[in-house]
Amino acid sequence: MAHSIEELAITTIRTLSIDAIEKAKSGHPGMPMGAAPMAYTLWTKFMNHNPANPNWFNRDRFVLSAGHGSMLLYSLLHLSGYDVSMDDLKQFRQWGSKTPGHPEYGHTPGVEATTGPLGQGIAMAVGMAMAERHLAATYNRDGFEIINHYTYAICGDGDLMEGVASEAASLAGHLKLGRLIVLYDSNDISLDGELNLSFSENVAQRFQAYGWQYLRVEDGNNIEEIAKALEEARADLSRPTLIEVKTTIGYGAPNKAGTSGVHGAPLGAQEAKLTKEAYRWTFAEDFYVPEEVYAHFRATVQEPGAKKEAKWNEQLAAYEQAHPELAAQLKRAIEGKLPDGWEASLPVYEAGKSLATRSSSGEVINAIAKAVPQLFGGSADLASSNKTLIKGGGNFLPDSYEGRNVWFGVREFAMGAALNGMALHGGLKVFGGTFFVFSDYLRPAIRLAALMGLPVIYVLTHDSIAVGEDGPTHEPIEHLASLRAMPNLSVIRPADANETAAAWRLALESTDKPTALVLTRQDVPTLAATAELAYEGVKKGAYVVSPAKNGAPEALLLATGSEVGLAVKAQEALAAEGIHVSVISMPSWDRFEAQPKSYRDEVLPPAVTKRLAIEMGASLGWERYVGAEGDILAIDRFGASAPGEKIMAEYGFTVDNVVRRTKALLGK
């Protein structure tokens, strides 16, 4: 170590981590003990951040992708002066504490992302770096480099084994994200044992092939060597950098260092005592921080951070004078607000016009893109099918970062995680598209978006067996039920173009949850009532889209998406036979469940017990709405390859079958 205060600070990070994990009787000490020098060097010598304001917009972003090493992050947050107290450290992994087992965004000040599912932190960091480049290209002007921060991540071997890290690293290299720097805690150990049991690839050649700069630090305790590598990484703005730092997991533990035993379990009282002796730590008290360490962090983090933000605020004030309209637009974007009156840009569709909801979604995207400049997104190599292209929006590429169309390539998981990073970064309203059946490929990222409360928008097209000829591999069955089961995710399957416009409006208005828009490939008719009723109806999750003509329905037809049009046609056929039913459009179960019982009973009158649910997906869940006297027309087997109309007929999604099933319910 160059200076004793630096050695003391690093040892303090290590001992705080050891003590918190011992007290919790649970946790992962090995990574914080091994990676403390690189994290300390980054936080005190390179990162621009202000603990007094964790939300300073131009701060450097830091993602601990190896989220199991959370005590490394919590120790740094505490020492740096973030609102994480010593009592918080003592409550590590306990009910209601600020220091959960893995870092959680929105839960702990200074935590930039929820991590723990390995690989996703790297991909979220890629998304943050993408957001920084786009916003810099959009808003920076001569003399005003308002947005120019770096994005840093610390990852481990496990992160690099995950497929999402490969997808994201490939994308980052392609996009030449030079302000992205990943420190790789390379300790040759995984949870199960030595790394050579499962991982022997040449990481350097792999990342160089992706288009990254690769640097290596041989001694993970040598902070001068680490600092030199970080300087070199920051100097190359033409490509992202991976810095492999060779470390010893559980550094200093005389019996456990360098073994898998120190990865995911407390050291134990005796080993903890011996480790502190090995560190020449002379303080008997647990959770002890020498006053000079606090002073050191004040001098290296808090004071410089406050000055840097103050200087940035001065620059922003001058920018507001020089570019008032641009500055107002940026301020609004940072605050997550939409332009006044933007919803007037939403198209309204006349009854009778047939249009696939993926196509109306594409029209909505292009209409709102003109009114909402922070709209930014793309597709996983399906833009022409998902209809996600912003016409005239330009391409987000190394020579045109101001472009609004992102070409994610066939990297669904990286797309999902990068969208999370963009949403975490702020300043953008982001969306990503793929086929609904491939939502499985990005599901873990959707789950993290829901867990973090991020308003990401998913454009999921080709939503049923109506896909047809491509067959069962491309026909979603269980996917609606699966996504509906996820907490804090709004799933909307609109019936027509007006419901689609309403769904987009609700998705953009969301501030605390992601939205999945589930859209058809095939044309569907625009229904008579939706121009007037769609927004409030979709907002409430379900509504009577076509009431029984006599005002006294004998039965209810409940449907979503393209099946609503089918239900309306069946309603007409039943009426011709003197049977009166109401049609309920139920685009969003989660929104409907959030309504008061009085509204739910208004839409689904308890007295009308004969109910038929119609949906081209799994039946699971519909029983709560149809009740004991109802019936469900759904699909609980895989699809088939044939023209869509033929498959729908074979699976019973015809007017004749709906009429027959309804009459059977009524005993007619």
Curated annotation (Swiss-Prot):
Q: Which GO terms describe its cellular component?
A: cytosol
Q: Which UniProt keywords apply?
A: Magnesium, Metal-binding, Thiamine pyrophosphate, Transferase
pH dependence, per the record?
A: Optimum pH is 7-8.
What residues does thiamine diphosphate bind to? Answer: H68, G116, P117, L118, G158, N187, H263, F438
State the Gene Ontology BP annotations. pentose-phosphate shunt
- Binding positions (Mg(2+)): D157, N187, I189
Active site (UniProt) = E412 (proton donor)
Under Gene Ontology molecular function, one entry of this record is: metal ion binding
**The EC number(s) this enzyme carries:** 2.2.1.1
Cofactor binding note of this UniProt entry: Binds 1 Mg(2+) ion per subunit. Binds 1 thiamine pyrophosphate per subunit.
Q: Which family does it belong to?
A: Belongs to the transketolase family.
| Protein's name according to its UniProt entry | Transketolase
Species per Swiss-Prot/TrEMBL record: Geobacillus stearothermophilus
